[in-house]
Amino acid sequence: MPALLKRLLFQVGPHPNERTFTLSSVSTDGHYISLRPFVKPSGDELSFPFEWAFAGTNETVKVNDQGNGVVTQDFNFWLDTNVYLNVPNTHRGEVNTTWKNWDSGCVEETGAVYPFGADKESVSFRELWQPVDPSREDLVIVSPNNEKFSSNARSIVLKVTDEAYDGLVIVIGRWIQGFLSQKNNNTIEGLNFIRLLEKDSGKSEFLLSYGKEVNKIPQSYENLKKGSTVTSNGLNWEVIEYHA
């Protein structure tokens, strides 16, 4: 089933915090994107107001159900902004994570990264996620008792890979997140992100728009089917998943 999760907490070391409005979208077929813009960016953050962003297809993650509400997910991100921008002390390669369902409906994610090299000391992290109902305009939490939306929420994924660009758009219910990156750029000038919300009126509202080429990211998702092509300002996107 598709999922939309809002992060409630991020912790490295003894002090938890949350400075972002992070949403992670996971499609029915397992494609994913996580956009993590700062709520109150300051200083150098103003030019690139993101803690992090990453995305990938289901070919870039290995998911294993361990039972008793525990799942492991091992990621090899297609897009990792830290890697794309060559940020110093950035983990490279697979990221191993463990996800545990809480009775409340929240999901705890734990794992470790190796920013100084695979043979160096690891850095452990912890994140807490709240599933929300993607079929609602407001951020309505999902508890173990109100998950009926899941069978009705649409799940649409568009992808672009050509000589100049990589890109992925994931539509989960009313909520849309996407990225477009220029190949061989590796600066913030090559990154573009959108987060859209389809309102009750039928119109879409930009909650996030970053980059000089966001107009190349599709912003309408009607009359599609798997395998079809959408052209947005000269860039062709393939529909790789369609459940509506």
Swiss-Prot record:
GO terms under cellular component: cytoplasm; nucleus
Residues annotated as signal peptide: none
Subcellular location: Cytoplasm; Nucleus
Modified residues (Phosphoserine): 143
UniProt cross-references to Gene3D superfamilies, sorted A to Z: Protein HRI1, C-terminal domain, Protein HRI1, N-terminal domain
Pfam families found in the cross-reference section: HRI1 (PF16815)
Keywords: Cytoplasm, Nucleus, Phosphoprotein
InterPro entries attached to this UniProt entry: Hri1, Hri1_N, Hri1_N_sf
Oligomer and partners: Interacts with HRR25. May interact with SEC72.
Family membership: Belongs to the HRI1 family.
Protein name: Protein HRI1
Source organism of the structure: Saccharomyces cerevisiae (strain YJM789) (Baker's yeast)
